[in-house]
Amino acid sequence: AFSPLSVMVDYDAENGWACKLLPVVCGVLTVPLPSARRFYKFGKSLRQAILSYPEDIKVAIAGTGGLSHQVHGEGCGFNNPAWDAEFMERLEQDPESLLDMTVTELARLGGWEGAEVVMWLMMRGALSAKVECTHKTYFLPSMCPIATMILEERSDDLPAEAPAETVARANRDYAGAEDLAGTYPF
C-alpha cells in the first residue's frame, strides 16, 4: 500500500508540514526480520508513550507497507487479493490472530515483499482493542496493491501501566544522567 503523505497533509516550502511528524523506519526486507508479534508489541509501546505525553494532543498513526506482492525471482508479479482482504479484515477485527504467523507464512500468502504487512501490525498495536473501519479501499493496478484503511478508536482501554507510572519510571531511570561528566544524554 502506498501512503502519499502530501495528499493527506498540507505542505508548503517555507513552513514545511502542517503537523509534526515522527517517522519510525522499519527494515523488513533483509533477515533477520522481527516477528509480527514484535512489531505489534512495538505499537503497544508506542501507544503507551503517546498516552504518557504531558500535553493533550491529537495523534494519527500511519502504517505503511505493501500487501501481497513480489518484485524479484520466479515469483515476480505474484499477488493474492484474497489474502489481502483477509489480512485487512483480521487487522481490524482480530489483530492478535495474526501475531504468531511466521515470516515464511506471510511470504507464502503474500510474496516475500508482502511480509511488509508487519508494519500495519505496528500501527494496529498502537490503537485500542476496539476500532471501527471508517474507510477502506483496495486497488491492484499492477505489481503491488494500493490499499488504505482508516481505523478509529472505539474504546478507551488503557495499557497495563498507567501513563503517570510510565513517566515516573522514565524519570527514575534517567535521574542524574545529566550530571555525568563528559556525556550528553539529553
Give residue ranges: language-model regions.
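Flexible, D/E/H-enriched segments
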Residues: A1-K41, S52, G73-P185
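Beta-strand elements within well-structured catalytic alpha/beta cores of enzymes
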Residues: V24, I57-L67
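Glycine-centered flexibility sites
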Residues: G43, G63-G65, P145
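Non-transmembrane, aqueous-exposed alpha-helical and coiled segments at domain scale
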Residues: K44-V59
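Glycine-rich nucleophile elbow surrounding the catalytic serine of serine-hydrolase chemistry
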Residues: Q70
